[in-house]
Amino acid sequence: LAAYGTHFGALPKTDAELDAQIEMNLALGNPYLVCPWHDMKTRDDALRLAEIMNETAAKLKPHGLRLGYHNHAHEFAKDGEDTLMDVLMENTEKEIFAEFDVFWVAYAGYDPVEYIRKYAGRQPLMHLKELAADHRANVELGTGVLDFAAIIRAGREAGVEHFIIEQEEYPLPPLESCKASLDAVLRL
């Protein structure tokens, strides 16, 4: 069993908090630290987060660690011409990555494949979560509306190293749901 990504809470971190994260992730052999949420509502919010992420990534880099951001739907709101996710990605250093959750990209009304291609080379991790026809999450992969063959193909072409099957609630017993989703991916 190997660790290849940790969600390490909100930014910014104090030096002591960041040092503890560095120590833990080095012990785990995990190179990828992910900010799983930020309350972005405006372009200025996204620009402030980009600045914080650039500063944090610079502190992680000497340890061989990289910083990323995990999206939800609110990052795809527009402030002006651009989505907040685009503002964030376009104002962070290139080694800062997106951990796209394809459910939330689609839920926000965007094509996950387009976003995967747009930020090729900047997404070593990807969350695969299905979108049901009625826009619910938490259904097994292959039972909803997302084209996982195209998503995984685009992810591989974009340099994704690890595809993470994500499901937060289970209509079936959890292990049955996990098996159904894994089987759906393996059939692709």
Language-model features, listed with the residues they occupy:
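Histidine-acidic metal/acid-base catalytic patches
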Residues: G29, D82-F97, W104-L188
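A broad structural signal for short, well-ordered beta-strand segments within beta-sheet-rich domains
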Residues: L1-A3, Q123
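Active-site acidic/histidine proton-transfer and metal-coordination neighborhood
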Residues: A3-Y4, G9-F97, V105, L175
